[in-house]
Amino acid sequence: MALQTTATATVSRTYPFSVRRLSDVAGAEISGVDLRDPVSAEMRDAIMAALEEFHVIAFRDQNLTKDEQQAFTLNFGEIEGHVGRLNSGEKYPIVHTVTNLDEKTGLPTETPTTHGNYFWHTDKSYHDVPSLLTMLHAIQTPPEGGDTLFANMLMAYEALPDAEKQALDGMRAVHSWEANRLNTGNTPASEEQKRERPPVNHPIVRTHENGRKSLYLGVHIGHVEGMDYEAGRAMLADLLDRATAEPFVYRHAWKVGDLTLWDNCVLVHRADRNYEMTAHPRVLHRTAVLGVVPV
């Protein structure tokens, strides 16, 4: 699939770091920055401006410990905790590992604990207050493949016919941890997890502070509020299929040392199994920043 991996558009503003646009859909490479250094207010604002322009930004050649990644993340807001658990029963730590390594053997596997990552989603939409930013720091990557795909929900919304935009306006979908587990074929949610994360509803069309609108979709959705269950799920499946079509997708090819940030408010993403999963480790350290209630 020849996804968007080149750019023709230019960078729209001046930044205090080197920026190279990676595609016209989303994505920019930032170089010449050491994220272990203190982050000034000016630098933080510039990073947030870059996220608004590019939606996904990759700081190359970083070498952060988990503590350093946590410290960097805190510049952007409150770090989220997690509802997911390791096979041991313990909850994921604040800086947790996204990997294809088996928890018991430490060897690469085709069925990692985090296999829900291979479905289109936006992080923590099963919360009243979902994720704003997610950060992944690439520790080990396959020699080829193991990419992450990002679909631009602003572009997908703008491409809809006007009549469909009007029909979707005001519609809400119910998101839950229980739906996530069912839709991804994972172990069903425990009663404790259901109590901790009861279903929430969010608009299918999200309106942002700058006035732009985007679709708000993904695998965490169980059904459409006030609509026949099967008809609503069919509508959502069709909408997500069109929204993640090739013209709206940027593929990020990981390099060891990447610290990649993305805006969950305007993107859905998924990992790709486009590598020999039983032969090559894929290890990334993850943090996420709490966002705002979608409107």
Question: Where are each of the predicted segments found?
Answer:
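Fe(II)/2-oxoglutarate oxygenase catalytic core
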Residues: 2-261, 265-295
